[in-house]
């Protein structure tokens, strides 16, 4: 297949710059296994699932991965920006930096706090309103401002432009410093239209996030509220949590012409033995596995064998799901509306069928659905599922 097979026209006004309020007021397009389309709200989700089904959530937490500061080389200062990509150890991260070509191995970089801009009260990371002012996510005092707020040394530079930073802090102390110094890494299609502000620290985080490590949100989960979770539980719909730390590669364009030639980026994830056992029991009892987001689906498919048995998993996955893939674990997928020619649109096309997906996306565009991270969602029933 050609990448151009997954192209479509999207008017700029369809790109959502803010989420629905409340979160579960977002529109929800349902796409049945046979292709029938319905128009509802996310708050209607309990009526669309059955007792015994289980929602699989990605509990990763977005970190404020955008850092700004100065390189100091023998008194020669240079303003720099960094986007953290992947944690390598308790004190080391890979990052994309500007201007990366002017940085050398051994350079010292001092990062300073990002200015606060409007928005709601509460956490800089979001999702836990009410932390005391000046405190980190762990309730610790904020690191000092100025040149000593957070420092790192350029440890290595790779041919693909990534830079390895060795920070002066490690473990929870480093996490706390990043939380106070960094800014939320809004997707490029939003950042190009407006600046990040304090409201994003809540909006760009799921209410159940708990494992720090992502530089992009698992956006399908942004629609869930405590009241919606309670309504699902009251109907007998279960929940399970997996962790996949979403990397900046999720926004990278596909630059090849043939789908088969694309080199998929890797992301780090984990499924516990308890979660694997629970999902296998749900499937054995006739319940459906409902993946909340493509990240949960990709991790679950990585950890599931040909017989449909989910196994514990810890490591990297670079699974690239395209039409023709045989799904092993997921029965239903809830996901936002994705970019043209993206790997995520290819995944949805594999799940629901290429023509069904094209028809549904035309319906979404014509019907005024809001697209991308802060936009509306679709509930897709696998094309070969009963």
Kindly give the residue locations of the regions a language model identified:
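Intrinsic disorder/low-complexity segments
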Residues: 113-148
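Surface-exposed, charge/polar-rich loops and edge strands
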Residues: 1-113, 138, 147-386
């Amino acid at each position: 297949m050609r990448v151009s097979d997954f192209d479509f026209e999207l008017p700029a006004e369809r790109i959502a710059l803010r989420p629905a309020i409340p979160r579960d007021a977002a529109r929800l397009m349902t796409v049945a296994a046979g292709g029938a389309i319905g128009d509802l709200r996310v708050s209607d989700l309990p009526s669309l699932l059955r007792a015994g089904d289980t929602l699989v959530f990605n509990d990763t937490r977005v970190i404020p991965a955008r850092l700004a500061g100065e390189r100091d080389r023998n008194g020669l200062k240079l303003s720099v920006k960094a986007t953290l990509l992947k944690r390598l150890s308790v004190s080391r991260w890979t990052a994309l930096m500007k201007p990366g070509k002017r940085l050398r191995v051994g350079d010292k970089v001092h990062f300073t706090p990002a200015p606060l801009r409007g928005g709601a009260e509460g956490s800089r990371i979001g999702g836990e309103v009410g932390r005391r002012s000046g405190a980190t996510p762990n309730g610790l005092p904020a690191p000092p401002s100025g040149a000593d707020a957070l420092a790192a040394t350029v440890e290595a530079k790779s041919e693909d432009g990534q830079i390895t930073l060795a920070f002066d802090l490690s473990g929870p102390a480093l996490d706390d410093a990043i939380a106070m110094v960094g800014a939320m890494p809004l997707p490029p299609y939003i950042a190009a239209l407006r600046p990040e502000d304090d409201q994003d620290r809540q909006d760009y985080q799921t209410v159940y996030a708990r494992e720090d490590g992502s530089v992009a949100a698992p956006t399908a989960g942004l629609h869930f509220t405590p009241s919606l979770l309670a309504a699902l539980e009251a109907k007998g719909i279960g929940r399970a949590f997996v962790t996949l730390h979403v990397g900046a590669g999720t926004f990278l364009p596909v630059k090849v012409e043939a789908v088969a030639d694309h080199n998929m980026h890797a992301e780090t994830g984990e499924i516990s033995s308890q979660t694997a056992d629970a999902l296998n029991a749900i499937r054995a009892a006739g319940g459906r596995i409902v993946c909340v987001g493509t990240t949960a689906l990709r991790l679950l498919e990585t950890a599931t064998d040909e017989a449909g048995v989910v196994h514990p998993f810890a490591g990297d996955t670079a699974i690239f799901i395209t039409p023709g893939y045989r799904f092993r674990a997921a029965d239903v997928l809830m996901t936002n509306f994705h970019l043209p020619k993206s790997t995520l649109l290819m995944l949805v096309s594999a799940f629901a069928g290429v023509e069904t997906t094209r028809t549904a996306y035309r319906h979404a565009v014509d019907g005024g659905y809001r697209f991308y991270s802060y936009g509306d969602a679709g509930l897709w029933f696998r094309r070969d599922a009963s």
